[in-house]
Amino acid sequence: MKVIIASDHAGFEYKIVLLNDIRQQGYEVTDIGTFTKEPDDYPDRAADIANAIINNKGDRGILICGSGVGVSVAANKFKGIRAGVCHDTYSAHQCVEHDNVNVLCLGERVIGIELAREIIFTFLKAEFSNAPRHQKRLNKISDIENENMK
């Protein structure tokens, strides 16, 4: 699985640590920024991840900011992106199994690094269930995207 990771300045410290952890578990990981702790704008990182996923440069994305919310809001503005904020392991697997989330959003100021690790590996190991009820709901989301994201 190819993983794309990015953060703004508020998520930079976790990104550096977690990037190495993900690689050590055998995942192919691409870091697309930010590369310093200088203040930057989270919508830019969300756009970078969204475009990478849309253009098949990665299978899943991980975005880290202060709360996880800002990057989630921005990433979800892209057709085909299903970004979810997860601050527990249940949400991390359920969001993939039921909603086929392709971008995990975390808040460095919200959770500890150990929990962040657990959430990331839970997210990466989870698989979409393909249950008819979940696929039906995803089809409805696609219809909403097609109607509203022109």
Which residues fall in each region the model found?
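A short beta-strand-loop structural module common to alpha/beta enzyme folds
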Residues: 28-39
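Glycine-rich phosphate/diphosphate-binding loop of Rossmann-like nucleotide-binding domains
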Residues: 1-24, 28
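Helix-adjacent hinge/juxtasegments
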Residues: 48-85
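Alpha-helical segments flanking ligand/cofactor-binding loops in enzyme cores
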Residues: 20, 47, 51, 73, ...
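Structural motif
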Residues: 38-47
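Short, structured coil segments at secondary-structure junctions
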Residues: 25, 78-79, 99
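C-terminal binding/interaction regions
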Residues: 4-6, 10-11, 89-150
